[in-house]
Amino acid sequence: MDFHQTVADMAGIERSQAKTINLGLFYGMGKAKLQAELGLNTKEEAEKLFEKYHSRVPFVKDLMNNTSKDSQRNGYITTLLGRRCRFDTWEEAAYRPGKLTSPMTWDEASSKFGENNIRRAFTYKALNKLIQGSAADMTKKAMLDLYEEKIIPHIQIHDELDISIESKKHANKIIDIMQNAVSLHVPNKVDYESGENWGDIYD
């Protein structure tokens, strides 16, 4: 399944637009950034695109808001395999255009703004950290399972592993190990390419 195309179909927009919004929202992308990324003429166009997206794909905004609230309340998010990503710095709760301050410790922030006027910093990135952290969990678990079978990757590149294979049967074994490294409610698909060397298949 192509997630970006699925969202594009739901929102009634182009796949490239859906992909930009899907990925950008996880980093807190706003109207100005969306306008620049898609080459739109005005911020109003970007705002209308956001409105169309969120009205037809409401679960994304709900997920973002809920994850942000959880991290604000608890001070951390927990990845798929239980690792905690903490939000230990603080900032003024009220947004003041042109008067941004650097994140501080709780003592510094409460002393400067008052303890009732501060919030945890960077919680808008909570969903991104949850997704990236959980993806890292899955990759690391797959690498451990491969190691148990004496299969050692040459290199890890983000969520990709470069491994020498002996045969198609060997490749299928690697794929099976990686796809079953973490048990999920939805199938975990592993894409596979092979060639005489990395340069032949890496683009």
Where would I find each of the regions flagged by the language model?
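Conserved catalytic core of nucleotide polymerization and phosphodiester-bond processing enzymes
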Residues: 1-203
